[in-house]
Amino acid sequence: MKIGLIGTGRIGAFHAQTLRGVPGVTGLVVADVDTARAAALADTLGVRAAPGIAEMYADGLDGVVITAATSAHATLIHQALDAGVPVFCEKPVAPDVAGTLGVVERARACGVPVQIGFQRRFDAGYRAAREALHSGELGWLHTLRACTSDRTPPPAGYIPTSGGLFRDCSIHDFDILRWLTGREVVSVYAQGANRGASFFADGDDVDTCAALLRFDDDTLATVTATRYNGAGHDVRLEVCGSEGARVVGLDDRAPLPSAEARLSWRRAAAPYATFMERFHDAYVTELEVFTEVAAGRVPSPCSPAEALDALYVAEACERSRRTGLPVAVAEVRTGAGGAAQGG
C-alpha cells in the first residue's frame, strides 16, 4: 500500500514516522508547500518527497494523510476525492461550518472514504469507559466532566487562524462525549476568560473556557479548557452513572498532586508535556485503522458528518460565550442550512 502525506510540520512528521512502521504500508511519499521541509523529512526517513501534490497523485496512491495548515484542509480533501483516493485528515475538516458542509456533501456523493483525526476515539482509556457505560456497569448516566489543559500556550501567531478555544481545543471533548454516550447535545451555556497573555484577547479569543452541555436524554456535562496548565498537559474525563463511575486520564503521569495528607501519590514519570505525548498510542492506532479503511476492509470510524456534529456544538458554545446566553444546537444547525445534515 502506497500512502501520501501532505504537510510535514510537527504532526505531519510524527504521522510520517508512524506510517513507516504500519504493517502493509510499503511506500510513503511526502509533500509540502515548503518543499525544503518536505525534502528534509524525506531524507531523514528514507522516503520520497514529491515536488507537488499533482505529482504525488500521479504516482498512484492507495490513501492520503492530510496534516497541512487548517485553512487548506477542505481544498486538499476535495482534491483527494477528485482523484478517488481515500483520505485521512486531521481536524478540523474546514475552518467553518460552510466549508465542512461542502466536504460532508461531497464525500457522501462520491463514496470515497474520509476519516477525520479525532484521535481520542482510539485511546484505551476512553474506549474502556465507553464499554463500561454501554455494558450497564455504571447504571444510567447522569454527569460527565471533561477537561483539556495545555501545559503551555501556543505561539501568538497561531491564534488568529486557530478558530478559537472551543473550535480548536474543546471540540475534541465535544466529539468524544457524543461518541462515548451515543447521544446528541441539545443546548449549551458557555463562558470564556483571559488571565494570561494579551494576544488571546487581541485575536478575539480566550485562554480559558467552560461550557455546560445538556444532552437529549437530560445528561449534563461540563467541558473546561485552558492554555495555561504549567504542571503538565492534562486531559481527563469523569463518566458518572447511578451505579458507578470511570475516570479517563487519571494515571501516574497526571499532573494532580493530592491535597490530602493521608494519600501519597507518587508519579512513575514526569507529567505529559504535550498532546502528542499524551495520545501517542492513539495516534498510532488511528493510522493503523486508516490503512484498513483505505483498503476497503472497514468503514471510516469518524466521518466528516461526525466532525460536523462536533463543530455545531463548538459553534453553539462560541455563540453562547459572545452573547452570554444559552444556545440551542438546533439553532446553529438550522442557521447553517444544516437541519438535515450531520451524523
Regions found by a protein language model. Name each.
Residues 156-220, 225-231, 305:
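Rossmann-like dinucleotide-binding domain that binds NAD(P)(H)
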Residues 63-66, 101, 112, 216, ...:
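C-terminal helix-rich "cap/oligomerization" subdomain common to oxidoreductases
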